[in-house]
Design a protein with these regions (language model features):
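A short amphipathic helical element positioned immediately N-terminal to and/or at the very start
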Residues: 1-16, 113-117
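Hydrophobic alpha-helix/TM-entry signal in multi-pass membrane transporters
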Residues: 4, 15-20, 56-60, 108, ...
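Transmembrane helix-loop-helix hairpins at lipid-water interfaces of multipass membrane proteins
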Residues: 10, 16-73, 77, 150-155
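Alpha-helical transmembrane segments of multi-pass membrane proteins
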Residues: 15-16, 63-82, 133-140, 161-175
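Hydrophobic alpha-helical transmembrane segments of ABC transporter permease domains
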Residues: 21, 25, 29, 33, ...
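Alpha-helical transmembrane segments of polytopic integral membrane proteins
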Residues: 34-38, 75, 90-94, 111, ...
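Short helix-capping/hinge motifs at transmembrane helix termini and TM-loop junctions
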Residues: 46-47, 75, 82, 101, ...
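Short intracellular "coupling" helices and adjacent cytoplasmic loop segments at the cytosolic face
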Residues: 47, 83, 91-115, 119-121
Length: 175
């Protein structure tokens, strides 16, 4: 079944591959901003260095703009890939329905076929978009947050690491 669905991605493979890249960039920018804020407080405010505050503030604005751009582009390409995937899937279903014999047409109701081509495909489309966006965003967020925690304070981050491993084990047993 997955092979059948994967065939419908066709010309949307590039959009499907670009979406996670933009999501990774967006998450990286989201994780850099608190680190820059810490630098402003630790090195700028406490020392009274206005040049440092201004410079790091400019980097924060740049990181926010890059993160916003990456988020918008990730959303755009994710939507393009998922809607194109759904369109191809509906087209393939329609072509398959056209080959039905009269006995098959009598077996499936028109309402059932319409539901399959609309609601079910829309659900698959939404699942594909969530796969493109969230299945990459969550692990990358975890990795970037862990990295930032170790950059700030490795001793405290080790507690975070133990908690993440514990939660991972619990989640595996729940599933």
């Amino acid at each position: 079944m997955i092979k059948t669905l994967a065939k419908q991605i066709k010309e949307y493979k590039s959009a499907s591959l670009v979406t996670p890249i933009f999501m990774i960039l967006e998450v990286a920018m989201e994780m850099v901003i608190p680190l820059l804020m810490a630098s402003i407080i630790d090195d700028g405010v406490q020392a009274g260095d206005m040049k440092h505050i201004f410079a790091i503030g400019c980097y924060m604005i740049l990181a926010a703009i890059v993160g916003l751009f990456a988020g918008v582009m990730g959303g755009k390409y994710g939507a393009k890939a998922s809607t194109g995937f759904a369109r191809n899937l509906r087209e393939a279903m329609y072509e398959n329905i056209q080959t039905f014999s009269f006995s098959n047409i009598d077996k499936f109701s028109t309402a059932g076929l319409v539901t399959r081509m609309t609601t079910d495909v829309t659900n698959i489309q939404n699942a594909y978009q969530m796969l493109l966006r969230m299945c990459f965003r969550a692990p990358v967020s975890l990795i970037c947050a862990m990295l930032m925690a170790f950059l700030i304070n490795a001793r405290v981050a080790s507690i975070y690491l133990v908690a993440v491993v514990f939660l991972g084990i619990v989640i595996i047993f729940i599933m």
